[in-house]
Structure formats: C-alpha cells, structure tokens
Amino acid sequence: MATLLRVSSLCRANRASAFKSLLIRPLPCLSQDLHMVQTSQIHTSPNHHAGSKAASMHWTGERALSVALLGLLPAAYLYPGAAMDYSLAAALTLHGHWGLGQVVTDYVHGETKIKMANTSLFALSALTFAGLCYFNYHDVGICKAVAMLWSL
C-alpha cells in the first residue's frame, strides 16, 4: 500500500526544489520517520554467534580428515606397518563417528531419543576403535588384512 505524497510536504522549505515532484511513498513514512528511514543501514554480513567459530572449526576438521583419508589409504597400501594400521584405525573411526553423528542429528527427534542415540554412537565408536586396535595388536593389522582379501 502506497500513497501519493508530495516530498515537499515531508521536507522543510529550505530544501532543493528538485524534491517537489510527486513520488510514491509508503504510508508509514511521515516526517518524523523520514530521518530514521534515511539513516537506517542494512547489514548483509551474517551475524556471528558465539558457537559459530566452533562449528566452523568442526566442519574444517571433518573436511581435513576426509582429505587426509584420500592420501592415507594409498599410503597404507604402499607402506603397510603398525603406525599406518593405528592411523587408519583412528581416522576411520573418527570419520565414521562424525558421519553417523550427522545421521543422528538429521533423523533422530525427541530429547530422550537423541541422548540415547548419542550415547549409543559414542559406545559404537569406542568399540570400533578398540576392536581395530585389538585387531592391529593381536592379528595381522588392517593393511595386511586388506592385502590378504585382495589376494583371494
């Protein structure tokens, strides 16, 4: 809704005569609101909240781990060993934990269900890491096991 007003009725008499033409103005724009409208600023930058830095760092860490896995998997094939086995165990467990954490965030609703799902996720991740470390220590290790599977 707009009303047709003369700008000169909103301005003082000492303003330039160029403002005497007819313009379409919104109804709430009265003389006392004109100063506020002229001086209001629009900020297009996003608001920075206290937790946004932590979320950004978490996202960066997830992406860094994903990129590191792209190099770690071929390196594990070329240079198998205990250090590579334990690095794979930690990286794969953390990558899986973060991925399943996003599934829990997206698809589990309700306060109690979320707490149970997160507790289960931490337990699953801890058991996965412990199992991979046990396999690395007491058996052939991840790298050699994958090589043995490929040789079948």
Curated annotation (Swiss-Prot):
CDD domains for the chain: SQR_TypeC_CybS (cd03496)
| Family, similarity comment | Belongs to the CybS family.
The residue span given for the transit peptide is: 1-21
Where, in this chain's numbering, is a ubiquinone bound? Y107
The metabolic or biological pathway listed in the UniProt record of this protein is: Carbohydrate metabolism; tricarboxylic acid cycle
Could you state one GO cellular component term attached to this entry?
A: mitochondrial inner membrane
Q: Which residues lie on this side of the membrane: Mitochondrial intermembrane?
A: 79-83, 136-152
How does this protein sit in the membrane? Multi-pass membrane protein
Q: Which residues form the signal peptide?
A: none
Top-rank taxon of the source lineage equals Eukaryota
Provide the primary localization: mitochondrion
Transmembrane ranges? 57-78, 84-104, 114-135
- Which Pfam families does the UniProt record give? CybS (PF05328)
Alphabetized InterPro entries for the sequence: CybS, SQR/QFR_C/D
Q: How does it assemble?
A: Component of complex II composed of four subunits: the flavoprotein (FP) SDHA, iron-sulfur protein (IP) SDHB, and a cytochrome b560 composed of SDHC and SDHD.
Q: Name one GO biological process term.
A: mitochondrial electron transport, succinate to ubiquinone
Alphabetic keyword roster = Electron transport, Heme, Iron, Membrane, Metal-binding, Mitochondrion, Mitochondrion inner membrane, Transit peptide, Transmembrane, Transmembrane helix, Transport, Tricarboxylic acid cycle
Mitochondrial matrix topological domain ranges are: 22-56, 105-113
Give GO MF terms, alphabetically: heme binding; metal ion binding; ubiquinone binding
Q: What name goes with this protein?
A: Succinate dehydrogenase [ubiquinone] cytochrome b small subunit B, mitochondrial
Q: What is the lineage of its organism?
A: Eukaryota, Metazoa, Chordata, Craniata, Vertebrata
Which amino acid positions bind heme b, per UniProt? H95
Function, please?
Membrane-anchoring subunit of succinate dehydrogenase (SDH) that is involved in complex II of the mitochondrial electron transport chain and is responsible for transferring electrons from succinate to ubiquinone (coenzyme Q). SDH also oxidizes malate to the non-canonical enol form of oxaloacetate, enol-oxaloacetate. Enol-oxaloacetate, which is a potent inhibitor of the succinate dehydrogenase activity, is further isomerized into keto-oxaloacetate.
Q: Which PANTHER family match?
A: SUCCINATE DEHYDROGENASE, SUCCINATE DEHYDROGENASE [UBIQUINONE] CYTOCHROME B SMALL SUBUNIT, MITOCHONDRIAL
Subcellular location per the Swiss-Prot or TrEMBL entry: Mitochondrion inner membrane
